[in-house]
Amino acid sequence: SPDSNAKTVNCESYDGTSWSEENNVITGVSWMTGFGTQTAAMIVGGTTGSGVLVNNSQTWNGTSWTEGNNLLVATEGNQGAGTVTAGLSGGGLAPSALLTSQTYDGTSWTEVNDLNSAHGYAGCFGIQTSAVMCGSSTPGRQSTTETYDGTSWTETTNFATARYGRSES
Protein backbone atom coordinates (compact mmCIF):
# COMPACT_ATOMS: atom_id res chain seq x y z
CA SER A 1 0.00 0.00 0.00
CA PRO A 2 1.20 3.58 -0.59
CA ASP A 3 2.99 5.43 2.22
CA SER A 4 0.48 7.86 3.75
CA ASN A 5 3.42 10.00 4.96
CA ALA A 6 5.05 10.25 1.52
CA LYS A 7 5.63 13.84 0.44
CA THR A 8 5.36 15.07 -3.10
CA VAL A 9 8.34 16.57 -4.88
CA ASN A 10 6.26 18.15 -7.64
CA CYS A 11 6.69 21.83 -8.41
CA GLU A 12 4.49 24.04 -10.56
CA SER A 13 4.59 27.69 -11.60
CA TYR A 14 1.75 30.07 -12.44
CA ASP A 15 2.05 32.63 -15.25
CA GLY A 16 -1.12 34.56 -14.44
CA THR A 17 -3.27 32.31 -16.62
CA SER A 18 -2.25 28.70 -16.21
CA TRP A 19 -0.07 26.31 -14.21
CA SER A 20 3.02 24.59 -15.67
CA GLU A 21 5.01 21.63 -14.37
CA GLU A 22 8.56 22.58 -13.32
CA ASN A 23 11.58 20.58 -12.14
CA ASN A 24 10.95 18.75 -8.88
CA VAL A 25 12.21 19.87 -5.48
CA ILE A 26 15.13 17.82 -4.12
CA THR A 27 13.47 16.65 -0.90
CA GLY A 28 9.72 16.32 -0.55
CA VAL A 29 8.52 18.09 2.60
CA SER A 30 5.32 19.54 3.98
CA TRP A 31 4.66 22.36 6.46
CA MET A 32 7.76 24.27 5.33
CA THR A 33 7.93 27.97 4.65
CA GLY A 34 8.82 29.68 1.41
CA PHE A 35 9.74 33.13 0.21
CA GLY A 36 11.13 34.93 -2.83
CA THR A 37 9.96 35.40 -6.39
CA GLN A 38 8.98 33.16 -9.29
CA THR A 39 12.59 33.12 -10.53
CA ALA A 40 14.46 33.26 -7.21
CA ALA A 41 12.77 31.49 -4.31
CA MET A 42 13.57 29.34 -1.31
CA ILE A 43 11.79 26.72 0.79
CA VAL A 44 13.10 25.94 4.28
CA GLY A 45 12.28 23.59 7.13
CA GLY A 46 9.30 21.29 7.17
CA THR A 47 8.68 17.63 7.82
CA THR A 48 9.27 14.54 5.71
CA GLY A 49 6.50 12.75 7.58
CA SER A 50 6.17 10.56 10.66
CA GLY A 51 7.31 13.48 12.83
CA VAL A 52 10.73 13.83 11.18
CA LEU A 53 11.58 17.56 11.15
CA VAL A 54 14.17 18.91 8.71
CA ASN A 55 16.41 21.96 8.61
CA ASN A 56 16.94 21.76 4.83
CA SER A 57 16.84 24.74 2.55
CA GLN A 58 16.26 24.46 -1.18
CA THR A 59 16.73 27.34 -3.61
CA TRP A 60 14.88 27.82 -6.93
CA ASN A 61 16.48 29.81 -9.78
CA GLY A 62 13.50 29.76 -12.13
CA THR A 63 14.64 26.49 -13.71
CA SER A 64 15.93 24.08 -11.07
CA TRP A 65 16.35 23.49 -7.34
CA THR A 66 19.67 23.34 -5.47
CA GLU A 67 20.39 22.36 -1.89
CA GLY A 68 21.25 25.35 0.29
CA ASN A 69 22.78 25.68 3.74
CA ASN A 70 20.62 24.34 6.55
CA LEU A 71 18.57 26.27 9.08
CA LEU A 72 20.11 26.28 12.54
CA VAL A 73 17.05 24.48 13.99
CA ALA A 74 14.97 21.76 12.33
CA THR A 75 11.37 22.97 12.38
CA GLU A 76 7.98 22.69 10.73
CA GLY A 77 5.28 25.33 10.56
CA ASN A 78 7.90 28.09 10.50
CA GLN A 79 7.12 31.41 8.81
CA GLY A 80 9.23 33.15 6.19
CA ALA A 81 9.65 36.44 4.37
CA GLY A 82 12.16 38.13 2.12
CA THR A 83 14.35 37.04 -0.77
CA VAL A 84 16.98 34.37 -1.44
CA THR A 85 19.71 36.88 -0.54
CA ALA A 86 17.92 38.46 2.44
CA GLY A 87 15.54 35.94 3.98
CA LEU A 88 13.85 35.53 7.34
CA SER A 89 12.52 32.40 9.05
CA GLY A 90 10.85 32.54 12.44
CA GLY A 91 8.76 30.53 14.81
CA GLY A 92 7.58 27.06 13.95
CA LEU A 93 7.43 23.84 15.92
CA ALA A 94 10.30 21.62 17.06
CA PRO A 95 8.13 19.94 18.49
CA SER A 96 6.69 22.78 20.65
CA ALA A 97 6.22 26.35 19.40
CA LEU A 98 9.45 28.32 18.96
CA LEU A 99 10.53 31.90 19.62
CA THR A 100 13.59 31.49 17.36
CA SER A 101 14.27 33.78 14.38
CA GLN A 102 16.97 33.38 11.74
CA THR A 103 18.09 35.53 8.83
CA TYR A 104 19.64 34.33 5.56
CA ASP A 105 22.22 36.31 3.58
CA GLY A 106 22.26 34.17 0.45
CA THR A 107 24.85 31.82 1.94
CA SER A 108 24.20 31.05 5.59
CA TRP A 109 21.65 31.35 8.39
CA THR A 110 22.26 33.48 11.49
CA GLU A 111 20.21 33.45 14.69
CA VAL A 112 18.78 36.88 15.48
CA ASN A 113 16.57 38.26 18.27
CA ASP A 114 13.70 35.99 19.29
CA LEU A 115 10.03 36.62 18.72
CA ASN A 116 8.12 37.92 21.76
CA SER A 117 5.48 35.18 21.41
CA ALA A 118 5.88 31.67 20.03
CA HIS A 119 4.20 31.32 16.62
CA GLY A 120 3.60 28.07 14.76
CA TYR A 121 1.69 27.88 11.48
CA ALA A 122 1.15 31.64 11.58
CA GLY A 123 0.96 34.26 8.87
CA CYS A 124 4.04 36.21 7.83
CA PHE A 125 4.77 38.71 5.09
CA GLY A 126 7.30 41.38 4.21
CA ILE A 127 11.05 41.49 3.73
CA GLN A 128 13.98 40.65 5.98
CA THR A 129 14.15 44.15 7.44
CA SER A 130 10.41 44.85 7.60
CA ALA A 131 8.16 41.87 8.32
CA VAL A 132 4.89 41.17 10.11
CA MET A 133 4.03 37.89 11.85
CA CYS A 134 0.54 37.33 13.16
CA GLY A 135 -1.80 34.75 14.60
CA SER A 136 -0.94 31.13 15.28
CA SER A 137 -2.42 27.72 15.72
CA THR A 138 0.06 26.58 18.35
CA PRO A 139 -0.54 26.91 21.20
CA GLY A 140 -4.16 27.55 20.27
CA ARG A 141 -5.45 30.51 18.31
CA GLN A 142 -3.60 33.74 18.98
CA SER A 143 -4.36 37.37 18.30
CA THR A 144 -0.75 38.53 18.70
CA THR A 145 0.91 40.53 15.96
CA GLU A 146 4.61 41.40 15.80
CA THR A 147 6.71 43.48 13.44
CA TYR A 148 10.40 42.97 12.65
CA ASP A 149 12.67 45.92 11.81
CA GLY A 150 15.76 43.94 10.82
CA THR A 151 16.99 43.85 14.42
CA SER A 152 14.17 43.07 16.84
CA TRP A 153 10.53 42.03 17.06
CA THR A 154 7.96 44.41 18.55
CA GLU A 155 4.44 43.47 19.60
CA THR A 156 1.85 45.71 17.96
CA THR A 157 -1.94 45.97 17.98
CA ASN A 158 -3.50 42.52 18.25
CA PHE A 159 -6.19 41.16 15.98
CA ALA A 160 -9.71 41.73 17.30
CA THR A 161 -10.30 37.98 16.88
CA ALA A 162 -7.66 35.31 17.51
CA ARG A 163 -6.65 33.55 14.29
CA TYR A 164 -4.77 30.52 13.14
CA GLY A 165 -3.51 29.12 9.87
CA ARG A 166 -0.77 29.96 7.44
CA SER A 167 -0.43 32.69 4.89
CA GLU A 168 2.66 33.63 2.92
CA SER A 169 3.35 36.30 0.39
Model regions and ranges:
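Polar, enzyme-active/binding microenvironments
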Residues: 1-169
